[in-house]
Design a protein with these regions (language model features):
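Active-site neighborhoods and metal-handling regions in enzymes and metal-associated proteins
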Residues: 1-550
Length: 550
């Protein structure tokens, strides 16, 4: 790691700059990038799914949001790396600018950062007289490796997607002066009904597209199993050349998924507008909801098998449980995991996104075990669920915290909402049930929920307390409700259930997709109201009827 930092400092000096931002993303801006291709991981050793780092002449700064504070502290070498712990409401841009001096120059790798991020950064940096400089190639990436060839791409049937790719193309009805630009692999997967499961924790083919009213041009190095009038397929390497040739058009694009490198190829005669594909894919078709109900039912069965294994007499490590959960998903028909399973026992359960299940950390009597998992089944839409289990008999503190988190979920799920309910409302209702634990050292330092779709973290919606997320729900949005409490070095509890918006008007209704029972041994029923006990009894009875309980 020290050699990489030294090389980067020499690179910065050669560019007459003062710092460089090293990213965790790949050149498709994917959320989950495997560690061998994760440049940020190679520099700091931090394995979280998000969080870039800044290398300067005298320091290395690792940005970590609330999910990763404890994990980053454990993984980085503090003799080399300083962890910048973002607080809720702050942004990575603020953290970046805070560590840079006035009149300094920051290098960004243009194909690893979104255009929208760069525009905001440039505006805020200008106030501090900080210059932003762009390079096209990541200085520490192995460019010799072609990452996107020889992968299998499959088409999801209309019984799940409702419309074929050709039908979606025809329904677009673009104007003569409009071009739809698709740079986000998840948007591409949605629009084409194509999936690729060769990359870990992803179902989206690595491809981009340029669409007009009579042509659908795909840019990829994968074999595409589609054929219809107007479809053309090109090598991925030619995408920017085609993009640069577009003139005097209204380009519809998801600006948050357009890399700065792609943006730099767009001629100034064009006008950029929002494509809204990200909103379309969030409103699931009824056929997709039917599939998700089936996929979550199978995910529930995986957790039942995990419960049985934990409560067997076997000596088990976290890694044993990690291997088991992958096996159980395969047994239930999953083609892959939608994210790396989190198996966190004992004090590790306080690490919100604990990433490395240990073969040395044995499960002991009284340990709580937090399991956060999900899979991709035949429909290529993610599942996501979290349960906290216990081995043997828990102490009173574990029961109190678990019950507190359970009460927060019940409150949010059963509340009568108005038709104008926002994403922010969901978070605020959940959060008000947990903040009084701050005084005891237990923190709820992540958002209440996220959208779920082809990617396990889909936007929209995002259920956060920030005013930017005071936006209305739409019918058939799928999202998580996942209250949690975590005390560093002690324990953590998270209970995550996926729901979908059954209706917005005249009444706002949500319905659960995951039905796995809660851990009775961790519930202090004396802390529940009568209505909460009634809800819990009905929930647990459903589990018994569906063979999810012992």
């Amino acid at each position: 790691m020290k050699n990489r930092v030294k090389e980067l400092r020499n690179f910065i000096k050669s560019k007459n700059a003062d710092a460089i931002l090293i990213n965790s993303a790949d050149d498709f801006l994917s959320e989950y990038n495997i560690l061998p291709l994760n440049s940020r991981y190679k520099v700091t050793g931090f394995s979280g799914s998000m969080g870039d780092c800044i290398v300067t002449s005298d320091n290395v700064y690792q940005i970590a949001d609330g999910r990763y504070h404890e994990q980053a502290d454990k993984e980085v070498d503090h003799n080399v790396v300083t962890v910048l712990k973002m607080q809720q409401g702050s942004s990575p841009i603020e953290e970046i600018l805070n560590v840079l001096d006035k009149n300094s120059t920051l290098i960004l790798t243009a194909n690893k950062v979104p255009m929208q991020f760069c525009q905001t950064l440039e505006k805020k940096a200008a106030k501090k007289k900080i210059k932003i400089s762009y390079i096209l190639n990541d200085p520490i990436e192995d460019l010799a490796q072609n990452k996107y060839t020889n992968v299998k791409v499959v088409e999801i049937p209309k019984s799940i997607t409702k419309y074929s790719a050709e039908e979606k193309f025809k329904k677009l009805k673009l104007k003569d002066n409009e071009v739809l630009l698709i740079t986000n692999p998840v948007d591409f997967a949605y629009f084409t009904n194509l999936r690729n499961f060769d990359f870990p924790y992803s179902a989206a083919p690595r491809a981009k597209a340029i669409v007009t009213n009579n042509e659908f041009e795909i840019f990829t190095d994968s074999k595409i199993p589609l054929k219809f009038d107007g479809l053309k397929i090109h090598k991925l390497s030619t995408f920017r050349k085609h993009l640069a040739n577009i003139r005097e058009k209204s380009i519809l694009v998801d600006k948050g998924a357009l890399s700065q490198a792609d943006f730099m190829q767009i001629h100034s005669s064009n006008k950029l507008k929002s494509s809204k594909i990200f909103e379309l894919k969030s409103q699931k078709y009824n056929t997709e909801i039917v599939h998700l109900k089936s996929a979550f039912a199978r995910t529930d069965k995986v957790l039942k098998k995990m419960y049985d294994l934990i409560n067997s007499n076997k000596q088990l490590s976290e890694y044993d449980l990690y291997c088991a959960i992958i096996k159980y998903f395969e047994e239930e028909g999953a083609v892959s995991q939608s994210f790396k399973p989190i198996i966190a026992s004992g004090t590790n359960s306080s690490i919100i996104h604990y990433s490395v299940a240990s073969d040395k950390k044995m499960i002991k009597d009284g340990d709580m075990i937090m399991i956060d998992c999900g899979g991709y089944f035949e429909g290529g839409i993610a599942t996501d669920i979290t349960r906290t289990f216990v081995k043997g008999n828990p102490n009173d503190e574990c029961k109190r915290i678990y019950t507190k988190v359970l009460k927060a979920f019940i409150s949010t799920y059963t509340k009568k909402y108005s038709p104008d309910t926002t994403w922010q409302d969901i978070d605020l209702n959940t959060r008000k049930n947990l903040t009084d634990e701050d005084k005891n050292g237990y923190l709820f330092n992540h958002s209440t929920g996220h959208g779920i779709g082809i990617s396990v973290h889909e936007f929209p919606p995002r259920c956060s307390f920030q005013d930017a997320f005071a936006k209305p729900f739409k019918k058939n949005y799928v999202f998580s409700i996942e209250p949690g409490l975590y005390k560093a070095g002690t324990a953590g509890v998270r209970l995550e259930n996926a729901v979908y918006v059954k209706s917005v008007k005249p009444n706002f209704e949500i319905e659960v997709l995951s039905h796995y029972p809660f851990e009775e041994r961790l519930i202090d029923r004396s802390l529940l109201t009568k209505s909460e006990q009634k809800f819990l009894d009905e929930w647990q009875d459903y589990g018994k009827k569906n063979n999810l309980c012992n």
